[in-house]
Amino acid sequence: VKLGLFFDLRNPGPWARPSVDHVARSIDIVIGAEAAGIDAVWLSEHHLFPDGYLPQPLAFACALAARTSRVRIGTAIMIAPLHHPAHLAEQAALADLISNGRIEVGLGTGYSPEEFALFGQSLDRRYGRTDATLAELRRLLDGGIVTPGPVQNPFPLWAGYQGPQGAARAGRLGVGLLSLDRNNAAIYAEALEANGHGASSARLGGVIDLIVCDDPEATSRRLVPHLAWQRQTYAVARGVEQTFEQAVAGIEAKLAETGRLPGLPVLTPDDAVDLVRKRTDGLPVEHVYLWASLAGMPDDLVERHVELVCSRLRPALGGA
């Protein structure tokens, strides 16, 4: 299993630093993590978020490619219906050249009406359009059509699909599946086999929501507003009416009731290793990635989390 860090470059108002400094610091975190042994970094895409969420992952991938030499750099995910396939293919090929063959491209459908309106697109048929974009990327990148072409052939493509229908779609396309849902692995493998790709070509990857630390109880308390910010902004993007204060109150109530943050395990390194193994054992998992930072998370928590991921989790999980 290749272990990675997941970046969205959020820089929320309550904890914001100048954008130039924030981007530079994010690059420095990647450089340091590479030196400490991390296998990959993965980048997400959103638009119009109030905290400067990363809007152009492949542009940032090029910056990382120029400053690193070994880590793989993936997108998880780019919103396919907001991008022309030829434009995507050219960007991916150039990033692959800059990195000397270290790019992975994962695409998904998106869900935010505001994002689609920004690009003059409709949410209608977004699943079919994402399928078509993945197929066209395969043709453009592997067929020698875009110039200059990428280093890698075949080019590593992923579908950020969830649920049984998404697993079947990824299998039909013959691409990797960015989902660690154990219930869908067999559906994905069967679709690969049925469509001539071979079940042995199955590649799974995905995020595990997890923060690693020395003191889970104290760290959990400090993470409440940052988790609330992340959850509230995602909810608003999906059309749910919720304030930041409501999100904080809900998470604080859950923490008081259970002693745990809802949906975010905060664990010591040994417990974190056990969790990742439980999620991945017996599956054809190629990549697992954890958030590098959570919406303005304090620097000391970020630094210790990244240090423990690199020094304790990666060796235990047999990173490549």
For each predicted feature, which ranges?
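Hydrophobic faces of well-ordered beta-strands that scaffold small-molecule active sites
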Residues: 3-7, 41-43, 73-75, 103-107, ...
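Short, acidic/polar
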Residues: 20-32, 91, 161-168, 271-279
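Alpha-helix-loop-beta-strand connector modules within alpha/beta enzyme cores
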Residues: 51-75, 129-136, 307-319
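Internal, glycine-rich beta/alpha segment that forms the wall or movable "lid"
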Residues: 84-201
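N-terminal beta1-alpha1-beta2 module of alpha/beta enzyme domains
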Residues: 1-68, 72
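Active-site mouth loops of central-metabolism enzymes
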Residues: 9-23, 78-86, 154-161, 213, ...
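An alpha-helical appendage that flanks or caps ligand/catalytic pockets
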Residues: 124-147, 185-286, 318
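N-terminal small/glycine-rich loop or linker at the start of catalytic domains
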Residues: 1-17, 112-115, 142-153, 242-261
